[in-house]
Amino acid sequence: MTLRHSLLAVLTLGPAYGYQLHGEVVERTRRDTPLNVGQVYSTLDRLRRDGLIASAGITDDNLPLYELTDSGIIEARMHLTEPDTPDWHDMVERVLLALSLPGSHHDALIAHYRRLWEPYAGASSETLDPTGGQAQAAAEHAARLLRSAALAWLDSLPVIEPWPLRTDRRRRGRRAAEAVQPPR
């Protein structure tokens, strides 16, 4: 799932500042790769340039707030209901994000993913396979297992209560190192 769409989806909850959006995306999607806060700010700049977000004022301590424009609302809703490819990582992050947000958009998203993962006719066998068909058979087997796992995961989703934006200030930086006592 793109960071662009994750930020738009979280902003459906209301105005937020950059570091707050960073924490919300990480918490709601349970990303399997680290998210650099600099990526968040550069993506917010592009979203503003593209007319999908606008300034929503500042916090009490002068942090800029962002909110969705009408175009941003439309793009966020489309992202939360209409996946375009059956990609495992995208599906997991997008479904977890959708489940964490209020509304019934997750039902449409899950239904679309089910259709994307339904069995389909395999890849063309016109390509010469120097392994005598073993590589093609192994690839088709992997695709069947992935489809089966995706559909099983969609069938076993827990009920997750949506939650609002966190308003507590997230701590930044590294934790203070414990004092090391010199040897005696």
Outline where the language-model segments fall.
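Basic helix-turn-helix/winged-helix DNA-binding cores
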Residues: 1-87
